[in-house]
Amino acid sequence: MAGSNIKVQIEKQLSERILLIDGGMGTMIQGYKFEEEDYRGERFNKWHCDLKGNNDLLVLSQPQIIRDIHEAYLEAGADILETNTFNATTIAMADYDMESLSEEINFEAAKLAREVADKWTEKTPNKPRYVAGVLGPTNRTCSISPDVNDPGFRNVSFDELVEAYSESTRALIRGGSDLILIETIFDTLNAKACSFAVESVFEELDITLPVMISGTITDASGRTLSGQTTEAFYNALRHVKPISFGLNCALGPDELREYVSDLSRISECYVSAHPNAGLPNAFGEYDLSPEDMAEHVAEWASSGFLNLIGGCCGTTPEHIRQMALVVEGVKPRQLPELPVACRLSGLEPLTIEKDSLFINVGERTNVTGSARFKRLIKEELYDEALSVAQEQVENGAQIIDINMDEGMLDAEACMVRFLNLCASEPEISKVPVMVDSSKWEVIEAGLKCIQGKGIVNSISLKEGKEKFVHQAKLIRRYGAAVIVMAFDEVGQADTRERKIEICTNAYNILVDEVGFPPEDIIFDPNIFAVATGIDEHNNYAVDFIEAVGDIKRTLPHAMISGGVSNVSFSFRGNNYVREAIHAVFLYHCFKNGMDMGIVNAGQLEIYDNVPEDLREAVEDVVLNRRDDSTERLLDIATEYLERAVGKVEDKSALEWRDWPVEKRLEHSLVKGITEFIVEDTEEARINAEKPIEVIEGPLMDGMNVVGDLFGEGKMFLPQVVKSARVMKQAVAHLEPFINASKEVGATNGKILLATVKGDVHDIGKNIVGVVLQCNNYEIIDLGVMVSCETILKVAKEENVDIIGLSGLITPSLDEMVHVAKEMERQGFDLPLLIGGATTSKAHTAVKIEQNYSQPVVYVNNASRAVGVCTSLLSDELKPSFVEKLDIDYERVREQHSRKQPRTKPVTLEVARANKVAIDWASYTPPVPLKPGVHIFDNFDVSTLRNYIDWTPFFMTWSLVGKYPKILDHEEVGEEAKRLFKDANDLLDRVEKEGLLKARGMCALFPASSVGDDIEVYTDESRTKVAKVLHNLRQQTEKPKGFNYCLSDYIAPKESGKNDWIGGFAVTGGIGERELADEYKANGDDYNAIMIQAVADRLAEAFAEYLHEKVRKEIWGYSPNETLSNDDLIREKYQGIRPAPGYPACPEHTEKGALWELMNVEESIGMSLTSSYAMWPGASVSGMYFSHPDSRYFAIAQIQQDQAESYADRKGWNMLEAEKWLGPNLN
């Protein structure tokens, strides 16, 4: 049957049901207990070496046995037979000196399976059976040295593998295979050689069969034998465009589940799995029964992971029969629609999407650009050369560029040697490789050494179209992305126009003629040196920057790269100025859309850190703003060559320093003083018999005082956090001594805390962790955006006593339900704590607690956490605590079930009929003074401080009261003053040292309302819709008011009035996460939380400032507005700025529309998680409405008819609608 027809037929089957692959062939053969003579048969009875164990040979010596096994699997329900050719390549057959029989074995195996499959298809024509020609991994590995003393050695080459696989593929096709199955991949480079061979044979024979790919995760590390993660492995072979991608062997279904789940999420094609029947026992046997295995398969299928299922080692026809029973009628996994992205990999994946931040390509492993690296390669000091690569990765390079083009080097041999050595260093090989050479043979040699998906640097049209197309096709077959230089037969592009012309021509050839994915095309439009003294060179940087923007606009999904250090070449020897030039140049390139650059990752300067006078001079040069810009830069360049800054701090002794060491430690803990904690802790250690006694004695005594004072309300949360910082520093000093003496101190329990997947907010979680640590609980904090799999895996590994989940956005509630279900499925017996801004006792009782049989406790604030944990971990207190909890939850559920809305629900039709009544005929919407997009980069923090609303800041620290009155509060006033001072001191540092960056943008677009939605137009002609913003409407009875919807405040399309809508996104948190992590690493939880709280306030202040500027200057409908900060906080202005995820527009995915409309991530670097949380966490976004009647409102509960209408307008099915509208669905 023709390959294309087979593909269509199989894809139809896969879309309708879960197909079954057969089970273990080796397992069935072992059941016959064959001896040497059985393997030999008559034909090979005089073979010169032992043949026992050569299972593939049985297709020649015992074909009836193989036929019977195939028959048994088809009778059990299998749809796809695998040929008995797992070890039938010439390379594997060499173990038996049978290389010459490889072709025959593959042919006969396919022919035999074909006959059996055709027989069963004839019996049941409505269920066709297919033959998958199997190409196994061979017994050699192309990525790993078999010699521990020589990590660069290989016992098989890429070309040898291609030759062996090509012979097998031809025979499998000739024998009648419907598909080619590349399976049990433990080394992805072997599989890349195999796929290269398969595609070459397809081209040679002018036939294309569907290809199935199946890898092997070898152990609990979640990686292949050669070290790749599931996603990295997928990215490396995605170019094959297989019909299915899957996992098999090594693990049983329990261990393999997590990785099949990952694959089902990332794979654009169908997903297969054929696990082992559990893990082998002490005798090498597999114990998982068909019924038990089918139970796992049923759960996988119902979870939506599967399109094909089968078995590997230890499985039998009975296993397949039971699987067939449990998947019958279960809907197969639906293919996901994934965003267009360049998906690269080393040992780990690197996905570059439209909204990704700038990608740094390390440049120092290049003999033409690094004298040190060239010397090391020339002297064959490869170990030291590897350290150069590792330094680049450690300094932030996400890709490393490797170039060996030097006249006195054998570039091809050096490239192969170095890449093979890199493969043995996980800290280097975790990132993708850019194979860089001007010689095609060197590029090909490099591509044959990298198992991940790398990048070729580079090809061009310099030698004509024919050669360009030939090389591009091979690069695609090797599975790499490509950099295309702006170079053709005329020469290098040095003007903006030539750059566009060449890149456009190359793009059209690659996409339209070669079939190269546009997202894997990276253009290098040539970076040339500026400030050379030659006038013709002055505009080189401007030409590049402008060409970047043109290419990004006109060549969809293509990316831009370049060798950044070229631009500053005329200042070689003055690294300070060169780094300033790089910083300025990159800043402008990135703003225009540049995706990546080849840079020295260890010497990247930050744009804002360049001194203002130098930055201005550099910008004059880069942007060609003045005729004398080169001379002005030269004048001040020398001044910066050896600039240095020093700082001395004085310490002063205090009276309490004369106290006994135990009291000094207590004083430091209570007062939060870190200055002397290490020396006092050391003194206490010397006085103690064992170092652990210092923790269990004076330090815990001091923390008990802190806990008592906090419990009595005499200390407040900020002070407790400072105390924890002191404690951490003391413990950090003692840890080496404790470890050396193998002592273990007692704690009250071990608690795992995590912000769930898709959510980036963790201030509350961090505070809870600190409070619990102060009460002698060991805390394992996994941070933010933590997957369910990671939470539960670490919980098991660390043997924790309690798991605590946190989240701020509403989609996190569903993720918490998922975690609870998984804990129940996996048999956890730990209490589960639930907390975060969107959580509630009602949601916990109704949605979470009923999915998990162990205690699930809603913790509404940090002060309650200690009491809850104490009760849950106490044998005496737990029974009564849980009993009261159960009674309370039952009461909450009853209240929820009886709860009636304050007003009755109405139909959507009725609600729409009661929309806000606005007389549009007598109202003219204001036209913006400055329409379009406005970007505020590195905005002045001092301006934002004037717009801070401090009341929520104190609430973060559990100090309740309104600012400024809280500063004079009888109980908390003194602590509020200290906290306020610390925050402002930190803000002073933020301003002075640039610790945080604030970035923001707003945009004003022509718009009209169409029913409940808002059409946003590309321009003032209003002929093309750029985006539709979808809205919900209040859906309860409103006898004296309206059923509000945000679209009511935009002029209807039919009114003929030209209205406008605004959008904005701001962050005050660029750098906040890194700072917080740095403070945490130094044991300073107080400042870690403080920087987060301050960043949050700056983000909200930025939103307030920008809205005012829009009203007064940009939109300009309130030019004479004069409001105090208090007036602004009280919203006494005209217009509103509702935010997706909040009451007036509670559905979070509308942020995605806003991001696309304004190009937020490209413009200012803010991104969205899978749950539509904003990153950085200290961010605000929303829409601007100008109508004087516009007001805030809450949607509350909606009915089924509105959910269906909303789903239809969004293009969702109802499952998707229920997921995102859940909190509002009645």
Swiss-Prot record:
Binding residue positions for methylcob(III)alamin: E696, G758, D759, V760, H761, D762, S806, T810, A862
Query: Which positions in this protein are listed as binding S-adenosyl-L-methionine?
Result: D949, R1137, Y1192, F1193
Work out whether the entry's keyword set contains RNA-binding: no
Q: Can you quote a single GO CC term?
A: cytosol
InterPro entries according to UniProt: Cbl-bd_cap, Cobalamin-bd, Cobalamin-bd_sf, Dihydropteroate_synth-like_sf, HCY_dom, HCY_dom_sf, Met_Synthase/Corrinoid, Met_synthase_B12-bd
Per its UniProt record, the required cofactor names are: methylcob(III)alamin; Zn(2+)
Miscellaneous notes for this chain? Answer: L-homocysteine is bound via the zinc atom.
PANTHER family (alphabetical) = METHIONINE SYNTHASE
Q: What does this protein do?
A: Catalyzes the transfer of a methyl group from methyl-cobalamin to homocysteine, yielding enzyme-bound cob(I)alamin and methionine. Subsequently, remethylates the cofactor using methyltetrahydrofolate.
> What's the protein here called?
Methionine synthase
What species is this protein from? Aliivibrio fischeri (strain ATCC 700601 / ES114) (Vibrio fischeri)
What taxonomic classification does the UniProt entry list for its organism?
Bacteria, Pseudomonadati, Pseudomonadota, Gammaproteobacteria, Vibrionales
Gene giving rise to this polypeptide = metH
